[in-house]
């Protein structure tokens, strides 16, 4: 069997090597992202145009028909009666 000390040394060396590779990769990635942000121009949003005027809808009435009011009132009364039981 091999010595446990040599296994720990090998494990530590592998860990440090892996952490070093990740550190170098992330450093290069940050450098490239900063370089790209300087080279590529920012997007300019399209100019805001004035909204189109909405035509006045005179055809529609703003009142509710009495049948609709009666139906809604009956439904509310029925619901309240069923909840109260």
UniProtKB/Swiss-Prot annotation:
HAMAP family: OadG
Gene Ontology molecular function: any one: decarboxylation-driven active transmembrane transporter activity
Localization: Cell membrane
Membrane topology, from the record: Single-pass membrane protein
Cofactor annotation: Na(+)
UniProt-listed Enzyme Commission number(s): 7.2.4.2
Protein name: Probable oxaloacetate decarboxylase gamma chain
Protein species of origin: Vibrio vulnificus (strain YJ016)
Assembly: Heterotrimer of an alpha, a beta and a gamma subunit.
GO BP annotations, alphabetical order: sodium ion export across plasma membrane
Catalysed reactions, as listed in the record: oxaloacetate + 2 Na(+)(in) + H(+) = pyruvate + 2 Na(+)(out) + CO2
Transmembrane region(s): 11-33
Biological function: Catalyzes the decarboxylation of oxaloacetate coupled to Na(+) translocation.
Gene: oadG
InterPro entries: Na_pump_deCOase, OadG
